[in-house]
Design a protein with these regions (language model features):
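Active-site-adjacent bridging/hinge elements
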Residues: 2-12, 86-99, 151-152
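Catalytic adenosine-cofactor/nucleotide-binding cores of aminoacyl-tRNA synthetases and other
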Residues: 53-147
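NTP-dependent nucleotidyl-transfer catalytic core
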Residues: 1-24, 41-48
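Long, non-coiled-coil amphipathic alpha-helical linker/lever segments
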Residues: 156-170
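Glycine- and acidic
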Residues: 12-22, 99-107, 161
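Core structural elements
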Residues: 174-180
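Alpha-helical support elements that line or immediately flank enzyme active sites
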Residues: 33-38
Length: 180
């Protein structure tokens, strides 16, 4: 592994940003003033500026001064970082305000991740282990059912890719979930 870049090398490797993500309450600064500052400095502009919504807890915007919020460490300690990321991309339409609740997180974790994707992965792995000594076999001739499944997969991949390119993570995950 190479050491991470720093200084000018890091800047050259990471700027300009394809997408500059900002909170909706500071969009004006990042859509007007920040680009003007970049142009004055002779630097390229980000490809797109996208304002995300607020995370609400108990119907209120998270606030340090009001001590309202969630502790990400607690959620990650309980569910793991991948489930944490999944929840916020799936449960809250990117760009809109959204609410977090432990109950909804737990329900989605169980139904969508454990019972859906997790069960599919576990069963497929177990079958390959049981019937093929843990090695995926070389595909044989495809039956009509195989071709139909491949078409459904292709559609799901195209739908997910199209949604992700529009920053619609909820729809992208929904396309994958629909295939599963």
């Amino acid at each position: 592994d190479e050491p991470p870049a720093s200084g000018a090398a890091k800047f050259a490797a990471t700027w300009p940003a394809d997408i500059h993500l900002v909170g909706k309450d500071i969009l004006r600064f990042h859509a007007v003033i920040w680009p003007a500052m970049l142009m004055a400095a002779g630097l390229p502009l980000p490809g797109q500026v996208f304002a995300h919504g607020w995370l609400l807890v108990g119907g209120e915007k998270m606030s340090k001064s009001k001590l309202t919020g969630i502790a990400p460490e607690q959620v990650i300690d309980h569910f793991g970082v991948d489930a944490f990321r999944y929840y916020f991309l799936r449960a809250i339409q990117f760009g809109n305000d959204g609410s977090f609740s432990w109950e909804d997180m737990s329900a989605r974790y169980t139904s969508e991740l454990a019972n859906g994707l997790g069960n599919l992965g576990s069963r497929a792995t177990a079958m390959v282990g049981k019937y093929f000594e843990g090695v995926l076999p070389t595909p044989g001739p495809f039956a009509n059912a195989d071709l139909a499944l491949a078409d459904l997969l292709l559609t799901a991949v195209q739908d997910a890719d199209g949604a992700y390119s529009k920053l619609d993570f909820t729809a992208g995950i929904g396309a994958v979930k629909g295939f599963v």
